[in-house]
Amino acid sequence: FRHSKDGKFIYLRYELKKAIYVYTYKTGDRAPVIEKIQTISTTSTKKPDNLTAACAMRMSVDQKYIYCTNAGENTISVYKRDEETGLLTMICCLPISGAYPKDVAVFPDGRHIASVNHDSGTISFFKVDYEKGLLVMSGRSIPVNEPNCCAIVKIGD
C-alpha cells in the first residue's frame, strides 16, 4: 500500500482483483477512522483474464501520480491523483514491451519510469507524457536475469 504525505489517503493494491482501493484516513477518539471512497481497475480491459495480476504500485515523488504494473496483461497503468479528494483518474494503461512486469520504479524527475520485467529478463525505460496519456519507450531494454524489484535514487543535487 501507499499513503499520501498528508496522511489523509491510503492506496491499497489488490493483486488478484486487479484494482486499487482508495481510502480516507482520520484519527478517531479510540481508533483510526478508515473509509473506502473508490475502487479503480488496474487493467485496460473490462474483463481481464485470470492470469492477469496487479503486481506493483508506486507513487511519484510529488505524489501527483500513481503507477501500477499488470502481469499477464503486461501493461503499466498511470493515474492522476487529486490532492484534495484523493481520487484517482486513469491516464493510460499501455504495454511495457516485456513480460511479467513485477515492479515499476519512478525516476526523481517524475517524467520517466522503469519497468522491471521478470519473465522476459529485462528492464524497460519510458518517458511518461501525462498530457497525451502515453508511455514512450526510451531506448532499448536492458537484459537482466529474472529481475524482481528496482529502486532509483537521486544522488546529489
Enumerate the language-model features and the residues they cover.
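Conserved beta-strand positions in repeat-built beta-propeller and related beta-rich domains
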Residues: 4, 12-15, 68-71, 115-118
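Internal helix-turn-beta structural module
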Residues: 112-149
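Beta-rich, blade/repeat-based domains predominating
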Residues: 1-9, 42-62, 97-112, 144-157
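C-terminal hydrophobic structural anchor segments
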Residues: 77-127
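Short loop/turn segments immediately following beta-strands, especially the blade-tip
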Residues: 23-33, 79-86, 127-134
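Acidic, glycine-rich loop-and-beta core segments that form the ion-binding/anion-interacting portion
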Residues: 1-43
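A short beta-strand motif characteristic of beta-propeller blades
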Residues: 38-47, 89-95, 138-141
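Loop/turn residues immediately N-terminal
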Residues: 17-18, 74, 120-121
